[in-house]
Design a protein with these regions (language model features):
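Intrinsically disordered, low-complexity, charged/polar segments
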Residues: 43-79
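Basic/aromatic-rich interaction segments and small domains that mediate binding to polyanionic partners
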Residues: 2-56
């Protein structure tokens, strides 16, 4: 699964506007996407309001590039 982040760039350890990121899983227990970000590590990000840890406001949104057969990303982001 893959998403494109659209919004304010966070810096070298988070996400960059327009870049496509791999989503390792949709964690339904905590309601988050596990994404490999610019740091090269995987972190949990809110599916509807992506922001770096500790930030007070969301900076952007996701566009789905590639979903699984069950539509897991669509459900998490738009559902």
């Amino acid at each position: 699964m893959k998403v494109r982040y659209v919004g304010k760039s966070y810096g070298v350890d988070s996400m960059t506007d327009g870049k496509v990121y791999e989503v390792l899983e949709v964690d339904t227990m905590v309601g988050a996407l596990r994404i490999v970000d610019d740091s090269g590590e995987d972190y949990l990000y809110h599916p509807k309001a992506p922001k770096p840890n500790g930030a007070k406001e969301a900076y952007g949104r996701y566009e789905i590039v590639e979903d699984d057969a069950s539509g897991s990303l669509r459900k998490a982001i738009f559902g």
